[in-house]
Amino acid sequence: MSKPDLDAFLHGDDAALRETNRRLESMPAEDRVRWALEHLPPQHVLSSSFGTQSAVMLHLVSRQMPEIPVILVDTGYLFPETYRLVDALTDRFGLNLKVYRPALSPAWQEAGLGRLWEQGADGIERYNRLNKIDPMERALRDLDAGTWFAGLRRQQANSRAELPVLRRQDGRIKFHPIIDWHRPRRARYLRRHDLPDHPLRDQGYVSIGDVHTTVPLLPGMLEEETRFFGIKRECGLHR
């Protein structure tokens, strides 16, 4: 595959973007990552929630670029099991972890604004802006991100069903090397490479965010209904 016209990608050449995505669709995830690291603009960064099966993307990308900055947005409300998994995977892979937090601590937010996640759709929207979107935008600016690797998958939600491998977002490139993977395929990858899953996976959690806005998957539920009380699936990071 020839080197893409990066300027065309960033400035609206949709035909070039579609053709590149057509070729990327036929490539294995490992080859997609290799191609992206060779051809897409720096700085390269990888975001991770350290949720279920998160070790897949961390292993897949960091084994080819060990020094890649790994962005974790710590809302202050993550599960204790998530914090322990962050420590374990950072030590195991030698991750270049970059932790970003909200400008206001959880206690300060609750003192002034109350429990935003209990205030309906508008409250959740504001909660996500303060605790997830603003810290991530700060991280991308600080790290001068040109290409953002993320572990989104089409299976996760209807809002992601049509996402391509490669797209533009806010003047940078967003790259989804496992966009077409299903959960069993990720589970096989974990077993093949002897990688740990999130401890809460065994308790029925399939998508893990903050303690107060995440529930296990129950019979009859869709995966996207396990977050934000079913009011929202997307927090706004991956629009």
From Swiss-Prot:
> Could you tell me which pathway this protein works in?
Sulfur metabolism; hydrogen sulfide biosynthesis; sulfite from sulfate: step 3/3
Give the GO terms filed under biological process for this record. hydrogen sulfide biosynthetic process; sulfate assimilation, phosphoadenylyl sulfate reduction by phosphoadenylyl-sulfate reductase (thioredoxin)
Active site residues according to the UniProt entry: 235 (nucleophile)
Catalyses:
[thioredoxin]-disulfide + sulfite + adenosine 3',5'-bisphosphate + 2 H(+) = [thioredoxin]-dithiol + 3'-phosphoadenylyl sulfate
EC numbers, comma separated: 1.8.4.8
Where is this protein primarily located?
cytoplasm
**Where do the coiled-coil regions begin and end?**
none
Keyword Cytoplasm: yes or no? yes
Note whether Chloroplast occurs among the keywords.
no
The record's keywords, sorted A to Z, are: Cytoplasm, Oxidoreductase
The signal sequence is none
Which GO CC annotations does the UniProt entry carry? cytoplasm
- Give the GO molecular function terms: phosphoadenylyl-sulfate reductase (thioredoxin) activity
A Pfam family this chain is assigned to: PAPS_reduct
What does the record give as the function of this protein? Catalyzes the formation of sulfite from phosphoadenosine 5'-phosphosulfate (PAPS) using thioredoxin as an electron donor.
| Protein name (record) | Phosphoadenosine 5'-phosphosulfate reductase
From which organism does this entry originate?
Thiocapsa roseopersicina
Lineage start: Bacteria, Pseudomonadati, Pseudomonadota, Gammaproteobacteria, Chromatiales
Q: Which gene encodes it?
A: cysH
